[in-house]
């Protein structure tokens, strides 16, 4: 029986500033929810660094957060948490 395959080496040097774009409906509480999740994974997260970009029609909002990534596991869990939030449509 072959041993389990090892994870490939990371292309990211940790710790590093890591931008994540989160898109969802332009609704009350969306930005606050994204910021709250970011703070759970990066307690030093600066909400002042959040970038907002509304869609052309204004129905959707792109929120770019930059977190301090400390590990692949942290980023994976952050992406999972954001992706499963009911207000979030897409995480890039």
Provide a role label for each language-model segment.
Residues 1-92:
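Long, contiguous binding/interaction regions
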